[in-house]
Amino acid sequence: MPGPTQALSPNGENNNDIIQDNGTTIIPFRKHTVRGERSYSWGMAVNVYSTSITQETMSRHDIIAWVNDILALNYTKVEQLCSGAAYCQFMDMLFPGCISLKKVKFQAKLEHEYIHNFKLLQASFKRMNVDKVIPVEKLVKGRFQDNLDFIQWFKKFFDANYDGKEYDPVEARQGQDALPPPDPGEQIFNLPKKSHHANSPTAGAAKSSPASKPGSTPSRPSSAKKAAPSSSASKSDKDLETQVIQLSEQVHSLKLALEGVEKERDFYFGKLREIELLCQEHGGENNDLVHRLMEVLYASEEHESHTEEHEGEEQVHEQPSSRRSTDSRSVSDNFHFV
């Protein structure tokens, strides 16, 4: 049996080479590499347990520069790693075959698309026996500190497992554009503010209207005065054209935003519908938890206040049969689709 400082490889062999590296404990496993194909069998990963911040910890700027250099990306902030796409390609680079890049959404912009990528990453971790729990719910929110902590751990994991073999990230993505996700604080709803004075139709009209004095009618207007209305009118037309272009861009942006919101709505509605069907299947078992879930699903907006919720619970205990009457309704009754 191995001693307290020894570890067993997946083959059952003693592996007495645990490394202590500035607060980072690295427990190596056996890695079998077939030259030419880089074929990995499951259980090959070198697990890294980061216990403290060391001098080797990279700054936010250095870590983003490293990600962009390795994967040929154009990320500008640590928060943009919340899509999970970069981690998926890192795993393909370290352990070819453990993840399918065709399934990775490199242009993910919505939270459920981020979750999809992290599910693929978690599956690849499981295949390679990576002993790391991915805090998906925190990462997909795009908060800086959560994403910085995870990428700093992943950098140490990468250094412990990378064998130095050349890797073409663009070719591996098979032509997929790896666009960085939108910044959490700069969503598509935050359209640029425009000056009402500079772009308003009345501003151009005010500039174009020539000043005239009542009662003074020049008998012979000069050529310069004749050219003035023409030039001011063309300037007004240009201002209007610019405004039309800006408004068209706003309409396009709002359409994209609406499509994203509708996708999220359909996604979460589908989840609620699945929960409803499960509750209906077990509704006849007189399960209190099922009835409570049904009450939450069918609760309308006016019944969601804290006070009325307590009153509803008291009525439920007094009249148990009233809870079962909600089974005839559907969760779709609380959704209004345009």
UniProtKB/Swiss-Prot annotation:
PROSITE patterns: CH, EB1_C. Residues 1-21, 171-241, 300-338 are annotated as: Disordered. Residues 57-159 form the Calponin-homology (CH) domain. Residues 300-327 have a biased composition (Basic and acidic residues). One of its GO terms (cellular component) is microtubule organizing center. Its main location: cytoplasm. It is found in: Cytoplasm; Cytoplasm, Cytoskeleton. It holds the Pfam family CH. This is Microtubule-associated protein RP/EB family member 2. It comes from Gallus gallus (Chicken). The lineage of its organism: Eukaryota, Metazoa, Chordata, Craniata, Vertebrata. The gene is MAPRE2.
